[in-house]
Amino acid sequence: MFEYLIKFYPKILFIVEGTLVTLKYSVIAVIFGLVIGMLLAICKVNKNRALRLFANFYTSIFRGTPLLIQLSIIYFASPYIIGVKFSVFMAGAISFSLNSGAYVSEVIRAGINAVDKGQFEAAVALAIPKFLIMKDIILPQAVKNIFPSLVNELVNLVKESAIISMLGEMDLMRRAQIVSIETYNYFFPMFIAACCYYILVMLISFIAKIIEKKMIVN
């Protein structure tokens, strides 16, 4: 077994290097997804019916269709729809961010609705602008309540980012596939990739628990 590992060490290193690519897509998607989700959530709780309809329609589209199809449309159909050919990186970043934003919006909306309405009414009575009420009073409490759900979304992004390999991006999955073809051994490369995904998820969960404990103390 030890000799086997020594022999395949360069291949193992090649696969593990794909972790950085996977992390890159996940981090970008969770950042932009959080921004998009927050804006959509605010639209969903807004009194303006047009904003609510738009936000709900957006969410229904991205939650109601497979991420693989969304990625394919953005990458392959964008030249025909908007006249722009996206790179693999841009197509992946855009599709993951838009998809994440739809799911995050529902999480944040639920968090906003969970905050005691009396606080909003009291702030309005004190003539505090609604923007500041949302920014300084409602959202901080909502984010604290939904933090575990946001972490779960990041974990899902790490795993779902594997579909970018379909476009030839050299992420964990794609590198494992290449090594599998080169060595005619499909178990070992996929096992290494699975271990990398597992370690990433466990690391994210560990860091999230530390942050959550500090949030509870504060």
Curated annotation (Swiss-Prot):
Gene3D superfamilies: MetI-like. One of its GO terms (biological process) is amino acid transport. It holds the Pfam family BPD_transp_1. One of its GO terms (molecular function) is transmembrane transporter activity. GO terms for cellular component: ATP-binding cassette (ABC) transporter complex. PROSITE patterns: ABC_TM1. Its main location: membrane. SUPFAM superfamilies: MetI-like. It comes from the Bacteria. It is a multi-pass membrane protein. Keywords: Amino-acid transport, Cell inner membrane, Cell membrane, Membrane, Transmembrane, Transmembrane helix, Transport. Coiled coil: none annotated. It is found in: Cell inner membrane. Belongs to the binding-protein-dependent transport system permease family. HisMQ subfamily. PANTHER family: GLUTAMINE TRANSPORT SYSTEM PERMEASE PROTEIN GLNP (PTHR30614:SF20), MEMBRANE COMPONENT OF AMINO ACID ABC TRANSPORTER (PTHR30614). Part of the binding-protein-dependent transport system for glutamine; probably responsible for the translocation of the substrate across the membrane. This is Putative glutamine transport system permease protein GlnP.
